[in-house]
Amino acid sequence: MSTTGKGGKAKGKTASSKQVSRSARAGLQFPVGRISRFLKNGRYSERIGTGAPVYLAAVLEYLAAEVLELAGNAAKDNKKTRIVPRHILLAIRNDEELNKLMANTTIADGGVLPNINPMLLPSKTKKSTEPEH
């Protein structure tokens, strides 16, 4: 038997190599494969490039991290350890860019921003400096 030919070792991948997900390759937490599948099944285009789902996953992960950080700060300001929809709403509405991005979005159980028109507040009267008799 000769050592060359079809009976040799498999070329390319070694036996010890493991599969690495596209998310891990890109250094992301969001699932690149699932986003790719959604893009293909959604019929947004006839063809989807290989970089498109990676880029979209990165953008979605960044936005989620930004909202979660601001919502965590809002929860901490209210002395809470759990983020609730109210904290997410406060985070989005108090940030200028996120508010512009999510202007037409309603968050369930989020409530509204506290806002009282200054005209409706009681007027501040000047206190006299003279002592009363």
Curated annotation (Swiss-Prot):
GO MF annotation terms: DNA binding; protein heterodimerization activity; structural constituent of chromatin
Entry-linked SMART domains: H2A
Family matches, as Pfam families: Histone (PF00125), Histone_H2A_C (PF16211)
Subcellular location as annotated: Nucleus; Chromosome
UniProt PTM comment: Monoubiquitination of Lys-124 gives a specific tag for epigenetic transcriptional repression. Acetylation occurs almost exclusively in the MAC.
GO cellular component, one term: nucleosome
Residue positions where N6-acetyllysine is found in the record: 6, 9, 11, 13, 18
Region (Disordered): 1-23
Alphabetic keyword roster: Acetylation, Chromosome, DNA-binding, Isopeptide bond, Nucleosome core, Nucleus, Phosphoprotein, Ubl conjugation
Modified residues (Phosphoserine): 123
Origin: domain of life: Eukaryota
Crosslinked positions (Glycyl lysine isopeptide (Lys-Gly) (interchain with G-Cter in ubiquitin)): 124
InterPro entries given in the database record: Histone-fold, Histone_H2A, Histone_H2A/H2B/H3, Histone_H2A_C, Histone_H2A_CS
Positions of modified residues (N-acetylserine): 2
Gene3D superfamilies, per database record: Histone, subunit A
Family, per entry: Belongs to the histone H2A family.
Free-text function comment from the UniProt entry: Core component of nucleosome. Nucleosomes wrap and compact DNA into chromatin, limiting DNA accessibility to the cellular machineries which require DNA as a template. Histones thereby play a central role in transcription regulation, DNA repair, DNA replication and chromosomal stability. DNA accessibility is regulated via a complex set of post-translational modifications of histones, also called histone code, and nucleosome remodeling.
Subunit field text: The nucleosome is a histone octamer containing two molecules each of H2A, H2B, H3 and H4 assembled in one H3-H4 heterotetramer and two H2A-H2B heterodimers. The octamer wraps approximately 147 bp of DNA.
Protein name in UniProt: Histone H2A.1
